[in-house]
Amino acid sequence: MNANDATLTGLATAHTGSTAGHPAPNAPAASSFDLILQAAAGSALGNSGTPYTLTISAIDLTCVTQGWPTLTLHQSFDAASGWKPSGTGQGYQCTQTFPVPVPGGGPGGPLAGHTLQCVASLISRGAWIVSIIHTNPFVLV
């Protein structure tokens, strides 16, 4: 990876507290699930403090509508935002877990049986760095 670049490398839905992706993240009867985001940054960027905006949204593919309100986070390439040196020493990595409440409070809610997909984007000021990623489609119960 270029020393001055960053990319979103993974986005998955999982049961709360799990690190393994799951196509029905609130099954069999949970009121929330986790969205796990992974990213990588080059050696010059990863601890530079450069600001960026991380936006996460959900799309209800069944009804072709917004699944729930968009999450917009103003973060920086620094330890406070979760960036740390990668195991290989060639750059930085970041893994963030976002708890997602199931709309309607849990199983049987208004999106039960719907297929959804989450999309995340990382955009630096001036759009020098832009990365977009999406989850596999998933179903809420």
Region roles according to the model:
Residues 8, 15, 19, 30, ...:
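Intrinsically disordered, low-complexity segments enriched in small/polar residues
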Residues 15-53:
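Contiguous beta-strand segments within globular domains
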Residues 65-105:
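Extended, solvent-exposed segments with strong compositional bias
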